[in-house]
Amino acid sequence: MRYTILSVAYPLTQVGPDAAGGSEQILTQLDAALTKRGHRSLVLAAEGSHVSGELIASPKAGKRLDDAARDWGQRVHKELIRSILGKISVDLIHMHSLDFHRYLPVSNVPMLATLHLPPDWYPAEIFALKNCNLNLNCVSSTQRRACPPSVPSISVIPNGVDVNRFHPTHKKLGYAMALGRICPEKGFHLALKAARLARSEFLLAGEIFPYSSHREYFDRRIAPRLDRKRRFIGPVGFQKKIQLLAEAKCLLVPSTVAETSCLVAMEALASGTPVIAFPSGALPEIIDHGRTGYLVSNVKEMADALSKVGSLSSAECRREALARFSSETMVTRYFDHYAKLIEGGRSAETRVQDPRRLSWLVG
């Protein structure tokens, strides 16, 4: 059966193959798979996004990403969703953003919200909704355990990456690297400290989004620690990321928050590159300590791990990624879940939302 799926991204962030955020990358993979399999994929995302299906572009909010821009983006998203549902027969809405509750439509269309971030970053009330057509999904078992135990129906579909686009190389170079959004919770200043302590070359790749806290973090915590051996190379496209991960001796993931998943760690392993990380959130689900990387507790242990990471097997890292982190497995599980929710929504009139139950959320 051919479905029409509306995927909704965060209003202020573009989606596409080169997107920095995990939620944008997962949305991009699902959009491509829907289109490839003959479904109609509608993507509501910021202007400038690149999708395989049909882009419904939300206008840019301006150069500054602040509370006013966020509020404006949420209002625009809400109106666009209402307009889409008035014109197109949508089978399911898949929300991917932290603030999805601000533009939930009042509709009998089944809705799935994937929680890409720690559960305590979302309003507690989303876990208390009953008898409505909003369904929640987690991206790791660790994240699911952090959700309120009173909500037994949250599904778990682990993230995956396109492992076939990453390839090991025998030409390993001497640098460690880190990659991601340049923001305080990623802890990249700690990776710089560890690299300096280990006297290791280090590359930091990523985008600085125009949030004042992100810019301040880079200026105060990152820039002063850069030198000829430890460099910041800015954002990189997908092809460059493939090369960098393959040639790195290891990936460093010094996250200071409970990661719900870690796509770049999966990509590194698919490249035959081991990962050294703090045991934050779901990272112990991804890294097999002493076999595909090391789980460390502090900067000193990260530096020590840098000195011995060369003894780990690149082939073993690659085998682990192929066995556990394939995007094909993720996509199949999502599509099965879509079908279940769509068929359930068609047969259960009690799942039609009462606007009064969601008024506190949608404003």
What are these regions (language model features)?
Residues M1-G363:
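Catalytic cores of nucleotide-sugar-dependent glycosyltransferases that transfer UDP/GDP/TDP-activated
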